[in-house]
Amino acid sequence: MNMRIAAILLLGYCAGMSTPAFAQKKDKLKKGPNISLNISAKKDSVKTTYLNIGLLTNIYQLKGIGINAVSSVVQNDMTGFQISGLASITGRHASGFQLGGIANVAGGNANGIMLSGLMNVAGGKANGIQISGLGNIAGNISRGVTIGGLMNLAGNKAQGVQIAGLANIAGKSQNGIAIGGLMNVSAEKLNGAQVSTLLN
C-alpha cells in the first residue's frame, strides 16, 4: 500500500511539473515572428487564415492547412491540419489533425488526431487519438485512444484505450482498457480492465 501511494505521488509530481509550462497563461499567447505565406479573407474581423506555409508562424485563427518547418502558433482556434517540424500550438481549441516533431499543445480542447515525438497536451478535453513518444496529458477528460511511450495522464476521467510504457493515470475514473508497463492508477472508480506488471 505504501509503495502504491509513493508511486502515485511520484508520477503526480512528475506530471504536475510538466503541465504548468504549457498552461500557465491562458489569456493570450505571446505575439511572435511570422515568417510564412498566408491566404486569408481581405475583410475578416476574426483574422482567419485558410492556408499557411512557412518557417515560423504566429497567426490568430486557422481554418484549413498550416505547414511550417519550425513551429506554428495559432492564437485562437485551429480547424483543419496544423503540421510543424518542432511544435504545433493552439491557444484555444484544436479540431482536426496536429503533427509536431516535439510537441502539440491545445490550450482548450483537442478533437481529432495529435501525433508528436515527445508530448501532446490538451488543457481541457482530448477527444480522439493521441500518440506521442513520451506522454499525453489531458487537463480534464481523455476520450478515445491514447498511446504514450512513457505515460498518459487525464486530470479527471480517462475513457477508451490507454497504452503507456510506464503508467496510465486518471485523476478520478477510468472507463475502458488501460495497459501500463508498470502501473495504472484511477483515484476513484474503475469500469473496465487494467493490465500492468506491478500496480493496478
Each language-model region and where it sits:
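Bacterial Sec-dependent N-terminal signal peptides
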Residues: 1-26
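Surface-exposed, glycine- and small/polar-enriched segments that build interaction surfaces at terminal
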Residues: 24-200
